[in-house]
Amino acid sequence: MQDVKQLTVNAIRVLSAEAIQKANSGHPGLPLGAAPIGYAAFTNMTFNPKDTAFDNRDRFILSAGHGSMLDYALYYLFGFGLTKEDIMNFRQLGSKTAGHPEYGVCPGVETSTGPLGQGIANAVGMAIAEDYLANKFNKEGFPIVDHYTIALCGDGCMQEGIENEAASLAGSYFFLTWFPSLFIL
């Protein structure tokens, strides 16, 4: 008998492959290869799928937005309100599951991503905001703001100028709470 982790990773891969095949369009590499990374992130993050705007939630940014089926499979399996029909309508006009994640369209998406590297810059901005809020509101013994921002990016993201600028900015702030979870695939 396989364990729950492997079954879930396999489900992410199968859902992604089925939706991409049905749409006859999409990028299967990232959701198939990064399924274990997505599973590990989501099983260790703080979030509430019934309240996706919960202030102290951890943020997951898929910078390599072309691999959006990874996001959608995770949102489906972790109860964010997507249906199997939503998954099978991947890349269809008017669908919640567009070719790139769109903020405000699909529950759970933290920011729209498309241009490579953009998600890294968004994650750095979110981490700066988190750091500011933590310094303003946290008191000893009362960590009101203590969430994390996680960015999953591909090699294409790391080759863009926007990533270099964002990484330079992040380095200048010496983030302690924004652990650089920039997985290079």
Language-model segment annotations:
Residues 1-12:
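N-terminal hydrophobic or amphipathic helices/low-complexity stretches enriched
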Residues 27:
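Globin-like tetrapyrrole-binding proteins
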Residues 19:
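Short alpha-helical functional segments enriched in proximate histidine and acidic residues
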Residues 31:
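Conserved phosphate/pyrophosphate-binding and hydrolysis machinery centered on Walker-type P-loop NTPases
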Residues 181-185:
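Long, well-ordered, tryptophan-enriched scaffold segments
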Residues 34-173:
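Cofactor-binding active-site loop characterized by glycine-rich and histidine/acidic residues
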